[in-house]
């Protein structure tokens, strides 16, 4: 075999980039929307938690957005060490997000990315087409 020693150190698994890596790659143009979508929908997303169930929204923006984070460290940087949170997958975000809201990933991070409500609708449509044809 050329270039292989016959061993598979990765156990046959393809390593997927972290959400933080995908955000950096997406904002720098290294990956496109489809690749970002694939990572986002399968990764864990950290969300600030309030007193009542549901997403916490920022309404002091042109359109309401919901802050979400690629890691607990990013969330803690934004909302403090003792902040409460919950986690969902990106796919669950797309399923549960109320209409008319966008999201901002890693709002205080070096590579923050904002998806307005229209972009979220496009992500949902893309997901539905991939799932149901």
Language-model features and meaning:
Residues 1-133:
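An interfacial alpha-helical scaffold signature
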């Amino acid at each position: 075999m050329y270039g292989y020693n016959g061993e598979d150190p990765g156990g046959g698994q393809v390593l997927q980039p972290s959400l933080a890596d995908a955000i950096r790659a997406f904002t720098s143009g290294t990956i496109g929307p489809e690749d970002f979508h694939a990572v986002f929908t399968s990764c864990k997303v950290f969300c600030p938690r309030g007193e009542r169930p549901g997403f916490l929204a920022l309404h002091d923006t042109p359109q309401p957005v919901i802050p979400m984070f690629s890691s607990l460290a990013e969330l803690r940087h934004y909302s403090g060490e003792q902040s409460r949170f919950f986690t969902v997958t990106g796919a669950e975000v797309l399923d549960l997000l109320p209409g008319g809201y966008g999201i901002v990933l890693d709002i205080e991070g070096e590579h923050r990315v904002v998806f307005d409500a229209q972009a979220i609708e496009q992500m949902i449509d893309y997901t539905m087409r991939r799932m149901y044809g």
